[in-house]
Amino acid sequence: MSKAHVIGLGKSGVAAARLLKREGWEVELSDGNTSKTLLQQQQELAAEQITVKLGQSLELNGDNLPQLIVVSPGVPWDIPVLIKARQLGIETIGEMELAWRNLRWRSQPQASLPWVGITGTNGKTTTTALIAAIFQAAELDAPACGNIGYAACEVALSWSGRGAGGREQGAGGDREVNSSSSPSLDWVIAEVSSYQIESSSSLAPRIGVWTTFTPDHLSRHKTLENYYNIKAKLLRQSELQVFNGDDAYLSQLGLSAWPNAYWTSVKGKDFLISEKGFYIENGWVVEKLTATSAPEPIVKVSTLRMVGEHNQQNLLMAVATARLAGINRDAIARAIQEFPGVPHRLEHICTWEGIDFINDSKATNYDAAEVGLASVKSPAILIAGGEAKAGDDTGWLAQIQTKAAAVLLIGSAAPAFAQRLQEVGYYSYEIVETMERAVPRSAELAKEYQAPVVLLSPACASFDQYPNFEVRGDRFRELCLAWAAGGKLQHNLMLSSSL
């Protein structure tokens, strides 16, 4: 029996281990951490004949080496053991690559399962969720997976084969027509991070989407050029390509780098980089599929409930993807009208005495936080801070000076952020350190400044105080709802819970 080793006991690692076990591999899984939760998972997987080693790292010694190593997305691709594995000729891949191979090999060549792959520094989760909603409104079985939180290997595990029906051709894509009740997939809608692209050698989507590109994850990828080339790999391996033409970096490369791509622009037809693409004109998303085709209105922009120009960019890319897959206007309009948005991305939590509390915890870098602040009403009370990342904060600071009545700083970045605010002549800030102090203070300041919005948009990672941005956003939501329910009566309880 062939032996496989999976690194990382998160959702992706567990799904990969189970998929390999189902395919007949002897599976071992390791994680350098140990906790009560991990020990429980260890017992559950042991019952499935999957060996789990906690508090240990993979070592490649002796003769009993694995034939395959699968890494979870959070595992750096250049750690010594993986470099050694490749030198020894041990195939080393990521969890998403494993899912891609499994689903592709189970499909017939004449009816291969198409994927949409969405990547980008910011905007990819919202775009992924909106694309999946549109495909599902068109009655396609098209799960969203990957970096969005549902592992691609979980999709592979849940799929037991296609139905007995044939396939229908659509403009730019095809769809399966099921004539049995057997579970089937029509598309896979995958949000793909740079980490996942890096470890996926053969992933080749039918449609690739690139939302934005700004400096991020440079502690892992070292240089901006490396980061760009990793992202570009996914698009180069995609049959059709959709780009955000309003992104400064991507548009600068333009047709010279991507001559056959479909480009988008919220600014109108005159700003479209190529002769084909999708743009906004007179309040409509307009489609122009070829240089000679007439422009066609597809859906009203006002159908989308989410605020901000960046969400109009996300809308354009989602509509472009849907049209290239052959989905009709009615399904697109229906899905967009019903789309509620994505948690932690300008998520409206509650309204208290006329003040909206908005959760933008996913804004983990300066660019995303700048967009978040630009998208809300002013003046706003901003909560920012956490674990700082490298990047250019110029635009973010300018947006604070324009839109923020006051800034409340939390986390380890608070002193550095305070210094940067002073350097640009902005002094309406307070270091409050914790979310428990920030929420009640933000409510007080909003009343004082008559600010219509309290916005959590950290411009930082969460790891100094929280396991991830979701937990940070959930805590903000919990505190906001408690404040709205009890007002100042909750203040002392919040403060005591932070001590």
UniProtKB/Swiss-Prot annotation:
Keyword presence, Lyase: no
GO CC terms, sorted: cytoplasm
EC number: 6.3.2.9
Biological pathway: Cell wall biogenesis; peptidoglycan biosynthesis
Gene3D superfamilies the record matches: Mur ligase, C-terminal domain (3.90.190.20), Mur-like, catalytic domain (3.40.1190.10), NAD(P)-binding Rossmann-like Domain (3.40.50.720)
Subcellular location per the Swiss-Prot or TrEMBL entry: Cytoplasm
Protein name listed in UniProt: UDP-N-acetylmuramoylalanine--D-glutamate ligase
Organism for this UniProt entry: Nostoc punctiforme (strain ATCC 29133 / PCC 73102)
